Amino acid sequence: MKRGSWIISQTWGNLFFLNFITSYGNLRKIVPQHLKLDSFQGYYFTSIVPFQMSDVSFPFTPSLPFSRLNELNLRTYVTYEGVPGIYFFTLDSNHRIANFVARNFFHLPYRYSNMHLRKNENFYQFKSNHAELSFKIGQSRVKNDRDKFITDRYFLFTQDKKFVLRGQVLHEPWVLH
């Protein structure tokens, strides 16, 4: 990316996708009407995604020293004007300042949650006020079409009063295990 062409940079690590098939009717009730629910082979997905964020910076700053945090988001998959993306129901993190900035400047539904991640070789345990998840990861694998539908998303959508807001999210393709 050219300097100045981005608003915020972050490093994401220890990221997991836990995916669930969800009914269209249940999702339609809680996703803003301007967003079209996106499906893969007729199935609608909701994902829980815990991860660690670090090295947050803005175009005019180095990485902020206090920018390491744990996060857990609950998301679904949508399109807006033909562009596929993510809609977040909630984004929990253990960093009050980051939550304030994300809520007030990016209109994202962040809330505070006490969170911890413990890692022991290939075993991970993620605890928050709202969830407790344990994982054991294996070898990396080749992505199938459903994996690509879920992980190869480069836009997020949120709503501020009457307006749909779109943010581009640039990242390398995720390596899955």
Label each residue range with its predicted role.
Residues F40-Y44, M53-D92, R96:
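A glycine-rich, hydrophobic loop/mini-helix early in the fold
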